[in-house]
Amino acid sequence: MRSKILSTLVMSFAAMLFGSHEVRAEHRVTIDTLTQLVAAFNAHDLDAVMSFFADDCELMMPRGPDPWGQRYVGKAPVRKGLATRFEGIPDVHYGEVHNWVSGNHGVSQWTLTGTTKDGKKIMVRGCDLLEFRHGKIIRKDSYWKIVEPTK
């Protein structure tokens, strides 16, 4: 009996420390979740995009002054950071999309196309590494290929 109580206490403590891996159905991340997120980006609907994010979310853009890119923390700063994407590339589109999900993590691979405000055409392959909690994005880490002009 004593070992059963000890075992239960240890398991409860471990779940408290490391989190439970059990995901409730309404919080489950699916391929459809990622598909809807990309659709919101392609619709340039910032309200719809932000509905996928938790209040304490974090965004790491592919470019910026630090090795991890420009970093935004919190829902309002993340919204502002994402708005710069739509402002800088007004016709931005994510195509050739492939999504993967494992537990509370997702990967969305895509080809970004668009035209910058100064008329430069962009086509670049990239991906987002996404981490979810309770069905909402808590971390979006974006990567782009480095495209160099041919000589």
Where in the sequence are the language-model features?
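Short, surface-exposed coil-to-beta transition loops
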Residues: 93-95, 109, 122-128
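Short, low-complexity N-terminal intrinsically disordered segments enriched in polar/charged residues
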Residues: 4, 17-51, 55, 151
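Bacterial N-terminal signal peptides
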Residues: 8-17
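Twin-arginine (Tat) signal peptide motif
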Residues: 1-7
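Short, cysteine-centered beta-strand-loop-beta hairpins and adjacent loop/turn segments enriched
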Residues: 88, 113-123
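Short beta-strand edge/turn micro-motifs at domain boundaries
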Residues: 125-148
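A short hydrophobic beta-strand element
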Residues: 103-112
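A solvent-exposed, acidic/Ser-Thr-rich amphipathic alpha-helical stretch
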Residues: 46, 51-101
